């Protein structure tokens, strides 16, 4: 299955498989998957609960390793990297929005958004100012600038989802992976979040979003079924 303009491919997956060993035996979650996604595409990953949507995104994010097959992000074969190089590559090139709203609760919204920019980077005064400015600009673009000094525990589900998007964008990565980003929010919030992803794709970001919600998939360029 392909959603490609042969040039400008951002994500390339070929014959990718992943299984897990459980007390009940081996479970093949992903079997021989192949697809390519071009830069600036907004693609949905669909399938039943437990079908492997989250596993696929986790592998593409470099958080898990496939059993077999190849994966390239922006021309880079991730399996060739050691943990240190992989972490640096991921921080620069991939924004990951997980199902778990994993915030540092004692940090403000602004601090949570800025955090990935400080990982592996300089923290001199000039750099801190630039990062803070970018974080505030992202919060403003997502309509939550007024929440910068709030704490995540005081926010609504929809507001927290926007904070996650801002945090994923802080390093300006070319690829955004979103795992059920509209889970537990109402239809209005779902439409708002999906419009944000659509705009990001139109600006050149490559978006891969796992979802079981037909409403969330309406603005996608295509779907990959697992």
Where would I find each of the regions flagged by the language model?
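Hydrophobic anchor residue at the start of the ABC signature
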Residues: 165
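Helix-to-loop junction immediately C-terminal to a conserved catalytic motif
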Residues: 61
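Conserved ABC ATPase "signature" region
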Residues: 77, 118, 126-146
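Conserved ABC ATPase signature
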Residues: 151-155, 159
């Amino acid at each position: 299955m392909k959603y490609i303009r042969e040039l400008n491919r951002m994500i390339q997956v070929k014959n990718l498989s992943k299984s897990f060993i459980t007390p009940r035996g081996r479970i093949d979650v992903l079997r021989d998957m192949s697809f390519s996604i071009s830069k600036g595409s907004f693609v949905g990953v669909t399938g039943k609960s437990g079908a492997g949507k989250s596993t696929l995104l986790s592998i593409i994010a470099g958080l898990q390793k496939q059993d077999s097959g190849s994966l390239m992000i922006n021309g880079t074969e991730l399996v060739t990297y050691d943990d240190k190089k992989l972490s640096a590559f991921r921080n620069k090139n991939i924004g990951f929005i997980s199902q778990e709203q994993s915030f540092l609760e004692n940090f403000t919204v602004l601090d949570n958004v800025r955090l990935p920019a400080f990982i592996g980077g300089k923290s001199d005064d000039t750099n801190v100012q630039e990062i803070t400015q970018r974080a505030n600009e992202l919060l403003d673009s997502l309509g939550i600038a007024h929440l910068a000094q709030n704490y995540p525990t005081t926010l609504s589900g929809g507001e927290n989802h926007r904070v996650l998007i801002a945090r994923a964008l802080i390093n300006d990565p070319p690829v955004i992976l979103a795992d059920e980003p509209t889970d537990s929010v109402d239809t209005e919030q779902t439409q708002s979040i999906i419009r944000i992803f659509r705009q990001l794709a139109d600006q050149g970001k490559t978006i891969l979003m796992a979802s079981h919600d037909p409403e969330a998939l309406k603005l996608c360029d295509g779907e990959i079924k697992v």
